[in-house]
């Protein structure tokens, strides 16, 4: 390999390195932008979760009837009567009870 070929090879290698460096810088800027966007979205998500938690707490405080009804539905779903006639007794084969259903369907 003569000097000109060696110089041309180094020049080509140098050009390739410059192109690669430019691509890396562009990727670096893109990653930085994505990290900033991710941080903003995480903060927004945290604020929204706090707001949702606050609203849910207000809803439960304003509507204790719903909380009680949900509790009764849970007991009924576990297979127990919630009606006045058979309260606390296990339902046979998880059959529906019209008295319990009437309580759950009240508004």
UniProtKB/Swiss-Prot annotation:
Sections of the chain in a coiled coil: none
Q: Does the keyword Nucleotidyltransferase apply?
A: no
Tell me its cofactors.
Answer: Zn(2+)
Is Oxidoreductase included in the keywords of this UniProt record? no
Q: What is its main location?
A: cytoplasm
Keywords in alphabetical order: Cytoplasm, DNA replication, DNA replication inhibitor, Metal-binding, Zinc
* Compartments where located: Cytoplasm, Nucleoid
User: What does the subunit section of this Swiss-Prot or TrEMBL entry state?
Assistant: Homotetramer. Interacts with both DnaA and DnaN, acting as a bridge between these two proteins.
The entry assigns this protein to a family as follows:
Belongs to the YabA family.
According to UniProt, the name of this protein is: Replication initiation control protein YabA
Organism source for this protein?
Streptococcus pyogenes serotype M18 (strain MGAS8232)
